[in-house]
């Protein structure tokens, strides 16, 4: 698992001291930040929408500066919410790159953890990728390359257990 800090909307007392809060959570092991974007832009009141969109953009920028990939999604446990976020909405479009990078990061971690036990928190990752920025970049790249398919997964299984990150990415490389 990738320990995720969470962010609601930046309005609570704790989230108003977000630098301090994220510093504490990173110190406790948080490696990504979970946000639910829809509740921060899909709001009828224009003033509230403007404020929450500003805060959403600010937290996305801060997450990037702190090397915290963004994990985004909807609140499917609440009636009336979307099944999938609308990343093309004007308020969301500027964040699309960060949202997709976070999705690839999570997918890369999931593929490598489930196939080889080489997920983000693994001994393998800590040995080969001790710096958070390099580790994040590796798992994002792995996620971009890890297209579904038996052949690609077999290549991962065939790697020696002491394989380097470059060898792993090469095993996931496109065939064309």
Please place each PLM-identified region on the residue numbering.
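Charged catalytic cores and adjacent phosphate/nucleic-acid-binding surfaces used
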Residues: 1-176
